[in-house]
């Protein structure tokens, strides 16, 4: 279940929900 946002969850519209701020 990997993806451009992995391991962060993504919405159906393709928006990424980056929970880990350390990746900024």
UniProtKB/Swiss-Prot annotation:
Coiled coil: none annotated. GO terms for cellular component: acrosomal membrane; extracellular region. Its main location: membrane. Keywords: Angiogenesis, Cell adhesion, Cytoplasmic vesicle, Fertilization, Membrane, Secreted. Signal peptide: none annotated. It is a peripheral membrane protein. It comes from the Eukaryota. It is found in: Membrane; Secreted; Cytoplasmic vesicle, Secretory vesicle, Acrosome membrane. GO terms for biological process: angiogenesis; cell adhesion; single fertilization. Gene3D superfamilies: Laminin (2.10.25.10). Specific ligand for the alpha-v/beta-3 and alpha-v/beta-5 receptors. Also binds to phosphatidylserine-enriched cell surfaces in a receptor-independent manner. Zona pellucida-binding protein which may play a role in gamete interaction. Contributes to phagocytic removal of apoptotic cells in many tissues. Plays an important role in the maintenance of intestinal epithelial homeostasis and the promotion of mucosal healing. Promotes VEGF-dependent neovascularization. This is Lactadherin.
């Amino acid at each position: 279940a990997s993806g451009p946002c992995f391991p962060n969850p993504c919405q159906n519209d393709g928006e990424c929900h980056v929970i880990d701020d350390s990746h900024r």
